[in-house]
Amino acid sequence: MQRKIKSYVLRAGRISNRQQQGLDLWLEDYELKFDSPSPWNFAKEFGRHDADTIVEIGFGMGTSLFTMAMNNPQCNYLGIEVHKAGVGSLVADLHEHQITNVRVVVHDAVDVLQTKIPENSLAGVQIFFPDPWHKKRHHKRRLIQSEFIQMLVKKIRPSGFIHCATDWEDYAEHILNVLSSESALFNQQKEGGYSPRPDSRPLTKFEQRGERLGHGVWDLVFIKK
């Protein structure tokens, strides 16, 4: 898969003292280096065998990833994020609460999936609130495209899941079409369409505010055959 168009733009944003502390002091405890020579062995990287590994692509400030890791200590979580403020925030939280079942990689998700994730190694992939690139001329920048999903399917084991969530209805329709068109997947909703928010996905403060204002959120959960 050759994807030259990035689904994100790196902007120079403010980093708080706590976030910088996370990057400077504790990132090395959690980071998987992209420049290692071979695909990762998750049993080695997490220090345990037989644990399911779930990847979150674009974890933002890490709120959902942190909560899910804390609630599911039996699972491994690998977070992929390019924005340093979010990485620092998550790492600081992980250190403060001594969470040990999370690793992070600070790199482009497409590159990571192509070269570092073994095939059939993941229990699931979650992509929560990816950039909708709502202007039509920018739709080509959207992360979730057919080629990208085809690559994800190879990395997920049979019965593994892809869970997407978005608060942009047009993007939800696009994601539904892309996932429904992939023959290796089936919709967890037997009647098709969108899923209720699974209890496993934490409700963010942003989402709670949106609900009060009447804004919609669409969850999509597809399973690999």
From Swiss-Prot:
Q: Where does substrate bind?
A: K135, D167, T204, K205, F206, E207
Keywords of this entry: Methyltransferase, S-adenosyl-L-methionine, Transferase, tRNA processing
Q: Known Pfam families for this protein?
A: Methyltransf_4
A GO cellular component term found in this entry reads: tRNA methyltransferase complex
What Enzyme Commission number(s) apply to this enzyme? 2.1.1.33
Which parts of the sequence bind S-adenosyl-L-methionine? E56, E81, D108, D131
Q: What class of enzyme is it?
A: transferase
Q: Which reaction does it catalyse?
A: guanosine(46) in tRNA + S-adenosyl-L-methionine = N(7)-methylguanosine(46) in tRNA + S-adenosyl-L-homocysteine
Oxidoreductase: is it a keyword of this entry?
A: no
- Which pathway does this polypeptide act in? tRNA modification; N(7)-methylguanine-tRNA biosynthesis
Q: Where are the transmembrane segments?
A: none
Gene Ontology MF terms in the entry: tRNA (guanine(46)-N7)-methyltransferase activity
Active site located where?
A: D131
Determine the domain of life of the protein's source.
Bacteria
The record's function comment reads: Catalyzes the formation of N(7)-methylguanine at position 46 (m7G46) in tRNA.
Q: Name the PANTHER family on file.
A: 3-DEOXY-D-MANNO-OCTULOSONIC-ACID TRANSFERASE/TRNA GUANINE-N 7 - -METHYLTRANSFERASE, PENTACOTRIPEPTIDE-REPEAT REGION OF PRORP DOMAIN-CONTAINING PROTEIN
- What family does the Swiss-Prot or TrEMBL record give for this protein? Belongs to the class I-like SAM-binding methyltransferase superfamily. TrmB family.
Report the protein name in the record: tRNA (guanine-N(7)-)-methyltransferase
Record organism: Legionella pneumophila (strain Corby)
